[in-house]
């Protein structure tokens, strides 16, 4: 029983680490291009996009852990690693697509349309590569995947909410739109970077 609690504790600790201190967007820049495209896009729900990305990252983590451990002894495992993890993302995406088609809920059409955009994302593949290059255990990988997904959800919500406020007339016209969004993301990234204990040299 204590081993199970210890494993859950490790997974939770890594989830919190990935959510706040190692946020995929603000500390590593993973998925920023997709995040910027989401701001102001009325066709794609930011909430559902981030939720699908979170589920995808959580499901890919154990699959990539087991698949990655199978190629360790191969001579070119470093070159095969990204392809293998991309295949893991594809398998999870196909699985999620099949589930969404089988359920046929009121939002199934929307979720099926958003799924490829959310699953095939540098945030998902980058998180898996971080997990495997750092040699995380299974519990650490699952926790980090969940935390990274929740961190992406947090970042999407922060930037989407800011997008509504960044349309102010007080902002000079040259900075409206993409420039002010990038400045806002940069300031948030510096705040997270400072939160992790790094000093910012200006």
Model-assigned labels for residue ranges:
Residues 10-26, 77-91, 142-155:
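Structural signature of hydrophobic alpha-helical transmembrane segments
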Residues 14-55:
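Juxtamembrane transmembrane-helix termini in multi-pass membrane transport proteins
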Residues 6, 190-202:
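Juxtamembrane boundary at the C-terminal end of a transmembrane helix
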Residues 52-61, 113-129, 177-189:
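Small-residue-rich segments of transmembrane alpha-helices in multi-pass membrane proteins
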Residues 164-183:
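Interfacial loop-to-transmembrane junctions
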């Amino acid at each position: 029983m204590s081993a199970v609690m210890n494993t859950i504790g490790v997974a939770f600790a890594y989830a919190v680490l990935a959510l706040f201190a190692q946020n995929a967007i603000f500390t590593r820049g993973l998925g920023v291009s997709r995040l910027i495209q989401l701001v102001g896009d009325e066709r794609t729900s930011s909430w559902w996009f981030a939720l699908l990305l979170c589920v995808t990252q959580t499901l890919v983590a154990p699959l990539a852990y087991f698949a990655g451990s199978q190629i360790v002894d191969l001579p070119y495992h470093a070159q095969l690693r990204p392809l293998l993890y991309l295949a893991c993302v594809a398998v999870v995406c196909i699985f999620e697509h099949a589930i969404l088609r089988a359920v046929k809920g009121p939002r199934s059409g929307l979720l099926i349309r958003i799924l490829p955009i959310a699953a095939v994302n540098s945030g998902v593949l980058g998180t898996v590569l971080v997990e495997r290059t750092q040699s995380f255990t299974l519990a650490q990988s699952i926790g980090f995947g969940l935390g990274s997904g929740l961190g992406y959800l947090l970042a999407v919500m922060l930037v989407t909410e800011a997008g509504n406020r960044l349309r102010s007339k007080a902002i000079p016209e040259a900075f409206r739109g993409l420039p002010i969004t990038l400045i806002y993301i940069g300031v948030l990234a510096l705040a997270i970077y400072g939160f992790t204990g790094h000093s910012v040299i200006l």
